[in-house]
Amino acid sequence: MYGNNNKKSINITSMFQNLIPEGSDIFSRRCIWVNGPVIVGAGPSGLAVAAGLKREGVPFIILERANCIASLWQNRTYDRLKLHLPKQFCQLPNYPFPDEFPEYPTKFQFIQYLESYAANFDINPKFNETVQSAKYDETFGLWRVKTISNMGQLGSCEFEYICRWIVVATGENAEKVVPDFEGLEDFGGDVLHAGDYKSGGRYQGKKVLVVGCGNSGMEVSLDLYNHGANPSMVVRSAVHVLPREIFGKSTFELGVTMMKYMPVWLADKTILFLARIILGNTDKYGLKRPKIGPLELKNKEGKTPVLDIGALPKIRSGKIKIVPGIIKFGKGKVELIDGRVLEIDSVILATGYRSNVPSWLKDNDFFSDDGIPKNPFPNGWKGEAGLYAVGFTRKGLFGASLDAMSVAHDIANRWKEESKQQKKTAAARHRRCISHF
């Protein structure tokens, strides 16, 4: 038996089962009926939807390719990481952070919080189960979700989940972005994506090139310096660097508050004026600002400003060097667009992540080619034919939580309405279905 909340489940798919003719290939794999939604992904977004459904008494199942919840946080983040925003903007619905947690919890505290969240709502994902494809079957009006489950020493097993609703909760950061630099294969030194970076201890005394100047690139560069390395950070394009706090108040919170009372352009001008007072002119350190303000840039393009947590003073003093774009790599060196050639020992690619939705969600017009819903926040959580999305707002955990509540509420209403049309008895199961939920 698979799934959660089984005691409360009501079979609302019996009418579809009765309509399916004998011999239909809808049961070509080991098949599992799900009487509620299938949630793909057990990160914060998937957990938030699951908790909302639990509160509504709606059965569901979560499929997670990793062996744990929040695998991005557990397996692909560096040790010194802390939340960049105050905890009240990062908590999931209906479950605040513990009072004793600091304003900016550590990575390990956040993982602890998520594990407590899952335990509190009795959320039990199916781990080590990778979705190969999900496709809406127009003939039967159902979703067909095909997976491969890694069962350890028992090998792997293929399943097909049949459901009325599917929630895509794999998020914006499912796959690493690894640029194809000329000559990188001949470099000969250590090359690592920031997702595999844990600590700068192994780089003591080494010259390290950090490619990327977002929050990860800045923080990795600072961590490298603190561990005795000599970091150089590649900055190809304009970037907004802001203080994490302005006069003791979170910059993010200040921006949110200002936008309630003034237009975005004025809020941007105010924040940039205050940032210049605190940080100085970042242009002269090689960190040129974009032409449009940080709040407008975030709203239009989803680009997050860098919140400085200590890297900028090291950049000012030259302890973290800023270098321009890359032309190509060579044996133990890199050639830059300004003509300089740097000798380096290691490369860390702080080049970010992307959605992997296009690789498995088939025949849909809801997501763009880059795996993000075409409709921007706050209208990007609901598609057609029972398709939902959470974690693609480009507004972090706060935006994901808002979408999760909308999704859970909408599915619960539809599930309850369909439940009324069914007899509240155990429904007949198709003879070829190996399990029922």
From Swiss-Prot:
Catalytic activity: indole-3-pyruvate + NADPH + O2 + H(+) = (indol-3-yl)acetate + CO2 + NADP(+) + H2O
Protein name: Probable indole-3-pyruvate monooxygenase YUCCA3
The EC number(s) this enzyme carries: 1.14.13.168
Keywords: Auxin biosynthesis, FAD, Flavoprotein, Monooxygenase, NADP, Oxidoreductase
Presence of keyword Oxidoreductase: yes
Origin species: Arabidopsis thaliana (Mouse-ear cress)
Organism lineage string: Eukaryota, Viridiplantae, Streptophyta, Embryophyta, Tracheophyta
Gene this protein is translated from: YUC3
SUPFAM superfamilies linked to this entry: FAD/NAD(P)-binding domain (SSF51905)
GO biological process, one term: auxin biosynthetic process
Positions of NADP(+) binding: 212-217
Pfam families: FMO-like
Residues that bind FAD: 41-46
Keyword RNA-binding among record annotations: no
Known pathway: Plant hormone metabolism; auxin biosynthesis
